């Protein structure tokens, strides 16, 4: 869908959904420019554009942690952690919009941390809401947590929503019939197909998607029973299947990750009263909670949406570990974790390439 929409003049949404109000307006011009610089090859331009989105996420994570802690080495380790997560490795390589959502959300937090003026926050939020309008809720949560002023929040939200309508109209003026208008209620009917019943397997899958599979990749499910291609999934509710950690490297990496997660939680609770960036940490938790509630019933494959919360998890951990960030032993631990992630998640990429190679 994105490959065709970004590299050809067929920009109409195949699924005719309204949740991406002016995504084409945001993505197609830079892809066209990169394609022009690459001798007219728009496909390579799209791949470079996505890779730049992934790189931007890493840079923004570094900027955020460096601004919060003043420690460049620690900031580099946390930025590398984000870049080496399964979520960012995959979506920094595929022609999809999710890596840019992560980048826009990261940018918003950087601007909040640096106490930038309202116009800058509005501009960052426009990118977020233009790609997928539901994620504007994350901007609202972050804004109100850091700037708890009702009038300011109303002014911020109203400005973004007014500009959203204008840019959506411009998007469909420049790219006719790209997708239906989001402000027409009937267009939401297309999302009914993405609603699933809440059961014990879904809750288990949700927990793993938010804290494990998005960082430490499990053994993927490859499915081709009733479709003309091989489907890569971590959760397949249609057949009640959920990916597991089967290999030794997967188990070692997941246990190491769990240990550092628990350590971060303990540090956060221990230092909660004297925490320098407490409200930003709470905002990050709030954004994760929003995604949990959203996906209780919405979404078939949670990993597909994982960039929407992986950034928040990594930034929260970066702030929680701040009290030990300058300790050499902890930096060595992070380096060891990064090494395990390179091995484990690199194996995932190799597996996907080997399975898909015969189809290319």
Label every model-predicted segment.
Residues 1-13, 156-219:
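Aromatic-rich transmembrane-lumenal/periplasmic boundary elements in polytopic membrane proteins
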Residues 12-40, 44:
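Short hydrophobic/aromatic helix or loop-helix immediately within or flanking a transmembrane segment
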Residues 48-68, 263-267:
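Transmembrane-helix motifs of polytopic, lipid-linked glycan transferases
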Residues 93-98:
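Short acidic/glycine- and proline-prone juxtamembrane loop motifs at membrane-interface regions
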């Amino acid at each position: 869908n994105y490959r065709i929409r970004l590299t050809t003049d067929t920009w109409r949404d195949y699924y005719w959904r309204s949740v991406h109000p002016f995504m084409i307006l945001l993505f197609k011009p830079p892809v066209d420019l990169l394609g022009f610089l690459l001798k007219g090859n728009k496909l390579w331009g799209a791949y470079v554009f996505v890779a730049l989105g992934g790189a931007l996420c890493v840079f923004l994570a570094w900027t955020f942690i460096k601004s919060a802690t003043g420690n460049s080495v620690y900031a580099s380790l946390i930025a590398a952690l984000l870049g080496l997560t399964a979520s960012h490795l995959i979506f920094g390589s595929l022609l999809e919009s999710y890596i840019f959502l992560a980048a826009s959300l990261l940018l918003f937090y950087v601007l909040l941390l640096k106490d930038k003026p309202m116009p800058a926050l509005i501009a960052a939020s426009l990118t977020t809401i233009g790609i997928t309008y539901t994620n504007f809720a994350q901007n609202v949560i972050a804004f109100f947590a850091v700037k708890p002023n009702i009038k300011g929040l109303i002014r911020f939200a109203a400005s973004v929503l007014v500009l959203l309508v204008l840019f959506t109209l411009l998007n469909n003026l420049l790219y006719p019939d790209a997708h239906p208008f989001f402000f027409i209620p009937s267009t939401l009917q297309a999302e009914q197909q993405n609603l699933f019943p809440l059961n014990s397997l879904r809750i288990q899958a949700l927990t793993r998607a938010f804290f494990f599979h998005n960082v430490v990749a499990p053994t993927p499910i490859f499915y081709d029973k009733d479709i003309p291609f091989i489907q890569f999934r971590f959760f397949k509710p249609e057949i009640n299947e959920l990916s597991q950690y089967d290999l030794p490297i997967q188990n070692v990496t997941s246990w190491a990750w769990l240990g550092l997660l628990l350590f971060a939680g303990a540090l956060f609770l221990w230092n909660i009263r004297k925490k320098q960036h407490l409200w930003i940490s709470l905002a990050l938790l709030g954004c994760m909670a929003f995604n949990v509630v959203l996906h209780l019933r919405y979404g078939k494959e949670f990993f597909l949406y994982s960039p929407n919360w992986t950034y928040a998890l990594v930034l929260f951990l970066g702030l929680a570990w701040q009290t030990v960030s300058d300790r050499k032993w902890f930096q060595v631990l992070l380096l060891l974790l990064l090494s395990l992630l390179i091995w484990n998640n690199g194996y995932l990429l190799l597996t996907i390439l080997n399975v898909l190679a015969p189809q290319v």
